[in-house]
Amino acid sequence: KNVSLINLDRCFDFLPEAWQCVKCHEMTDQVLLKSAKELDKTFQWLEKSNFEPQFMPIIDNDEQALDFVLDTARYYRYPAVELVFKDDSHRMISSEVIDRFHAMGIKVWINSLTLNFPLCGYHDDICSLFDDPNKGWGWLCDHGADVIQTDFVRELNEYLDQRY
């Protein structure tokens, strides 16, 4: 308590129960709620909630979700957005969109975990560790990532220390 950030990630199906649990432990100010599913319904729930958790939308290869987040960012202050993209050509990773998020004070969070499907256009941990970190983590930095989620924190920190 008062030390950690609670990441409620993709929990829309049981969000009221999860939120009640956090309230019982008086830790509502430590929550970051992340969701890609039904952003409009999540947003409606947030508006009705007595408490306002920090909400970070996950935009998962979805133009409609991207536009929804860009539109609602005018009146709901997102601390960050998580961008999930299959390849480099997706509009969400364009400098125009990234610059727009940054101009609104919204951090860009990119997940570089390696799964069975691309989360960041294959600029992931495997690319960074076994090919060239400049093509992985470096590419993400060059394209505006403020936060890189990784399972290889030490290696990423070493790369960033070397780079900067």
State what each model feature region is:
Residues 56-164:
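C-terminal active-site rim and adjoining tail of enzyme catalytic domains
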Residues 1-64, 83, 104:
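Metal-dependent phosphodiesterase/phospholipase catalytic core, i.e.
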